[in-house]
Amino acid sequence: MALDRSIISKTTWYSVVLWMMVVLVRVHGAAARPNRKEWDSVIKLPTEPVDADSDEVGTRWAVLVAGSNGYGNYRHQADVCHAYQLLIKGGLKEENIVVFMYDDIATNELNPRHGVIINHPEGEDLYAGVPKDYTGDNVTTENLFAVILGDKSKLKGGSGKVINSKPEDRIFIYYSDHGGPGILGMPNMPYLYAMDFIDVLKKKHASGSYKEMVIYVEACESGSVFEGIMPKDLNIYVTTASNAQENSWGTYCPGMDPSPPPEYITCLGDLYSVAWMEDSEAHNLKRESVKQQYKSVKQRTSNFNNYAMGSHVMQYGDTNITAEKLYLYQGFDPATVNFPPQNGRLETKMEVVNQRDAELFLLWQMYQRSNHQSENKTDILKQIAETVKHRKHIDGSVELIGVLLYGPGKGSSVLQSVRAPGSSLVDDWTCLKSMVRVFETHCGTLTQYGMKHMRAFANICNSGVSEASMEEACLAACEGYNAGLFHPSNRGYSA
């Protein structure tokens, strides 16, 4: 039967022709590509819904946390700004994204592009438009917990924005900073302790105010925050940049491959963080599952099985969530609708810097680029010397405390012992905090470098040492030491 074009509008005629072309393409390709999911996206229009059986119900919420400050930690705020822009492109609303960042990077005098933050050597500005919900002194563990729980009464400062989620909503939490066994750093003391965080997640679950939650954590020893204590029945899935015993890594650093623009003297990103975000940007998140991203990020963060310059990405909690599509948490960018499954897969190793050394890395870059005779060069050298001195003091003090508590033959082995996989770091988290406070009172603040000794304090608790004995050992180990700016009276206690 012929179609009478005279009775059909031009727009309708074009629609009919387009429909016929689509049918022909489908018929022609059906035999060669019988799996619908393999070929449907090739002929879809950007405005066409991708999944007819979508499980999308409720609101997507997100909490993004950069847990550090200082230009040497540029990459953490860059990670968070990148995550924000990715979620906005995915359709999440600003009112449903809560951002924690100190906000001392974009306008820092060391930033060669004033007011701009990038997360990739060829990246665009990620800072513009990022909401300043909790900045400066308001980036605290207490505020973070209040935001997650939706408890405005516990907030101190900030925008007042919280996760006011409902039972059908999904939540995505992303954290980037330094860490140590059982802890995550924050720019204002105290640090975030693992059991406190787990307790908050349990409270959130008990409130019945979300359907499912996905958490990504970038930090050294980040697996220890969940290992042995993360329940599987909270409808929460977690991946971490590293296992319970290893470092995570900064990348896109000066003098390395890939390198940032030559005017930059600090690392732009972190290996795990850029791995998951660049993966999300390169894929149709209505097609890619949480599990697929986990596998991709795991491979890239290992630096393709080069664990001397990479780490083991771990997963905890409810792994049933891994079957779901990523868009349920990160949203969907229509521009990615036709991206093929293997789009953007990197197969090359990346040069990296140990997260704990990034601060010294910045100082060394500053020293190298200073004028040979400048007073500034001398000041930088003093900063390097002071930083190294305090690191040696922390390392030496912890080692000596082990000797005083257990004897010269056992001290080191007890403090460095690692529990069996799947075990929690410590039995008594209150004891852990107490031991840290005793140490910091007499020996100075741990700092982001000293976080690595948290396992030693955990083992002191696990072996039954009393607080009085710990006090005595710390007094003997650090007697006469002037912590100066590193004293907790200046920085606060990390516990």
Swiss-Prot record:
Residues 1-32 form the signal peptide. GO terms for biological process: proteolysis involved in protein catabolic process; vacuolar protein processing. It is an enzyme of class 3 (hydrolase). Keywords: Disulfide bond, Glycoprotein, Hydrolase, Protease, Signal, Thiol protease. Coiled coil: none annotated. The record marks C267 as: Required for post-translational maturation and enzyme activity. GO terms for molecular function: cysteine-type endopeptidase activity. Glycans are attached at N138, N320, N376. One of its GO terms (cellular component) is vacuole. Its EC number is 3.4.22.-. Disulfide bonds join C253-C267, C431-C461, C443-C478. The active site is at H178, C220 (nucleophile). Asparagine-specific endopeptidase involved in the processing of vacuolar seed protein precursors into the mature forms. Belongs to the peptidase C13 family. This is Vacuolar-processing enzyme. It comes from Glycine max (Soybean). The lineage of its organism: Eukaryota, Viridiplantae, Streptophyta, Embryophyta, Tracheophyta.
